[in-house]
Amino acid sequence: VKCGACSAVCPSFRQDRRESQSPRGRIALIEAVLDGRLAVSDLYQDRLATCAGCMACEGQCASGVPVTSIILAAKEQAVQESGAGIVQSVLAGALRHEAVMRSLSWLAPVALHFSKGSVAGGGAGQGSRKIRNADYGMRNGSGQQVAARKKVIFYPGCAIRHFQQDIQQSTAAVLEHLGYHVVIPDDLKCCGRPFLSLGDRDGARNLAEQNTRVLAALDAEAVVTACASCGMTFKRDYPELLSRSGIRPAAVMDIHEFLADKLAASDLSTPLHGRITWHDPCHLGRGQGLAKTARSVVRRIPGVMLVEMDRPDQCCGFGGLMRAVHPALSRGIGRSKARDIIATGAATVLTGCPGCRMQIADSLRLEGAEVAVMHTVQVIEAALRSAECGVQSAEDREIEKVRN
């Protein structure tokens, strides 16, 4: 860490060029606290909170220092010694209460509303509005009425459940098209990722135990999520969080991982039209090693041209609750990502994380760009069900030209 090579890829350091906001700087502060040379303070906790948890530094570190884990442990120690800050306490309180989260659901359509045209037709915000009052009859499903069909449990996570139900709609539609009965249990909780970011490891452990018990009681071929952060938390953090209780973690797959094995290019019979680019969520690429897998799924979508942006795996600035705790820093990082997207000339940017989707949508809005921001499953649904989704395929466009 002391060589500083990690600073070159740290989004918060690249944005403000402050040593205390670099991986090396944060580790130095943590060492000073452990050695008794520095007391835990609001400023110390503030500097730890400038870490987005993107893990780019770990990929750059020749010594293999687990920087992200060290920072999360330091946050936990700081909260135990001095308590959480005001913003962090408010966030934790909101995350613990479903009613509060539901009351904020109007924020997603506002954040995504500006997305105008897209490769799948219509804006991302339109999907958010469509699903709002819809009942797809998937919750609390026992699967008895469709016993002959294979069952998949969908874990939505907080962002999809409360803010972007259009992703849930598309995921269910794609899985059902492939012959699966989709079950979304009502009593699933937050995955715990925000609590880890806040330094509340006990809170995260409690959620991990609740979720694992719910999933263990259901018999299904797979548990699938469309949120990169949730997927990473289940895979990387649940084994340690559950080690005391002896509960075995559920095997959870990201939707790209699942579709890479189940979805054939021949399933996507409706050619779409458009130039797209892809943003690697930190928790999907570095967190789960699925960057190539996600692209393999995207490339199966007929009729679209994938144009890679510069630094597709550069953090968008949403992670680690940075958007809430350090909004100006988060916006700066996000706008840098938006400019990379704009430079591709793509009409649509795809990603595999609802948090990234919200952040990128807002960042593109700030840059004045009309680029649609969509989850991969939304475009796949369009290629599967163009007529039902109101999507105009390339073939339909040609027919319309002839008619006119």
Predicted regions and their residues:
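Short amphipathic alpha-helical interaction patches enriched in hydrophobic/aromatic residues
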Residues: 14, 34, 58-61, 195, ...
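A ubiquitous short alpha-helical element
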Residues: 11-16, 39-42, 93, 344
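Iron-sulfur cluster-binding cysteine motifs and their immediate structural context
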Residues: 1, 5-29, 50, 54-77, ...
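Aromatic/His-enriched, Gly/Pro-containing loop or helix-boundary segments
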Residues: 31-53
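Residues immediately within or flanking Cys/His clusters that coordinate Zn2+
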Residues: 3, 7, 45-58, 188, ...
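Alpha-helix C-capping/helix-to-loop hinge sites
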Residues: 13, 33-37, 285
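Iron-sulfur cluster-binding electron-transfer modules in prokaryotic oxidoreductases
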Residues: 67-389, 400-404
